[in-house]
């Protein structure tokens, strides 16, 4: 193996936010301070008070 440089820690952007439920970093919903990925949001949306998903 050669030299290895670890990826830089991000301070902003898509790589910073992660889902609080599963830890996924893609398609995180930040609105209203939810911080859930779209898949987890669909599962718990009704419990959070969103009436569309039931």
UniProtKB/Swiss-Prot annotation:
GO biological process terms held by the UniProt record: cytoplasmic translation
Binding site for Zn(2+): 19, 22, 37, 40
Known partners and oligomeric status: Part of the 30S ribosomal subunit.
Protein name per UniProt: Small ribosomal subunit protein uS14
Pfam families the record matches: Ribosomal_S14
Cellular component annotations (GO), alphabetically ordered: cytosolic small ribosomal subunit
Superkingdom as given in the UniProt entry: Archaea
Recorded family membership: Belongs to the universal ribosomal protein uS14 family. Zinc-binding uS14 subfamily.
Residues annotated as transmembrane: none
Role played: Binds 16S rRNA, required for the assembly of 30S particles.
Binding note for cofactor: Binds 1 zinc ion per subunit.
Molecular function, one GO term: rRNA binding
Keyword tags: Metal-binding, Ribonucleoprotein, Ribosomal protein, RNA-binding, rRNA-binding, Zinc
Cofactor: Zn(2+)
Gene from which the chain derives: rps14
Native source organism of the sequence: Saccharolobus solfataricus (strain ATCC 35092 / DSM 1617 / JCM 11322 / P2) (Sulfolobus solfataricus)
């Amino acid at each position: 193996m050669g030299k290895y440089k670890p990826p830089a820690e991000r301070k902003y952007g898509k790589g910073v936010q992660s889902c609080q439920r599963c830890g996924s970093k893609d398609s995180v919903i930040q609105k209203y301070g939810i911080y859930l990925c779209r898949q987890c949001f669909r599962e718990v949306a009704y419990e959070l008070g969103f009436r569309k998903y039931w």
